[in-house]
Amino acid sequence: ERIARLVLIATAAKASPWTIAIDETQRMAIEADATFGQPRNDAGMKGLAAARAIGLLTYRGAAGYNLTQQDREELPAAHRASTYQQYQGEKLCRRYNAYSYYAILNAFDTHDVGRGRGGTDAALARIAARTLLVGITTDMIFTPAEMRALQRQIPGSEYHEIDSPFGHDGFLVEHEQLNDILRPFMEGQPTENNN
């Protein structure tokens, strides 16, 4: 009743075993850094860089990497994909410390909209807002199948898909597609599911 419109982009009702496994792999990378656990802000930074590199593989996926990280030389001194992973790991280390990232991973794993609300089906069935769900064709974190399941559970909801080689990050890259999906919905116009 308080919310007239709800947009859910590349998400799920609860953490899946797959996403928990991805997060655990990142935690293991952080824990493998011998400095993690020491009482200082820069502890675990090599582990954090490795964890970020692991996470990026799932955010972008094979198609995204194969499209953007091809080597331009026959025998490069450093592969583009390698330097990209290193750069992204170092970049995250400038914004986070390992303890914060570790806590975020733990929080992700506890996500469950049905907890304390009679289960997932009951919680989603109570949504009265006009709801738009947007999935991404190559998202391996929150798959189109999971998004379609949400659509079946939320009364009267609509489902659209962004066609993108960039996996979960597709909604950050495919601005025009996302705008074309969101604009009519936000303006209150009727939309047709594209899937």
Predicted regions mapped to residue ranges:
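Catalytic active-site module of serine/aspartate enzymes centered on a nucleophile-bearing elbow/loop
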Residues: R148-A149, G156-N195
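Residue-level signal for short, function-critical loop segments
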Residues: A12, T137-D139
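Alpha/beta-hydrolase-fold enzymes
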Residues: A4-K91
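Conserved alpha/beta-hydrolase "acid-adjacent" motif
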Residues: G116, M140-E146
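Short, conserved loop/helix-junction motifs that constitute active-site signature segments
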Residues: L124-A128, Q153-I154
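Short beta-strand/loop motif that positions the catalytic acidic residue
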Residues: I127, L133-G135
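Active-site nucleophile elbow and catalytic-triad environment of alpha/beta-hydrolase enzymes
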Residues: Y87-Q88, A103-A123
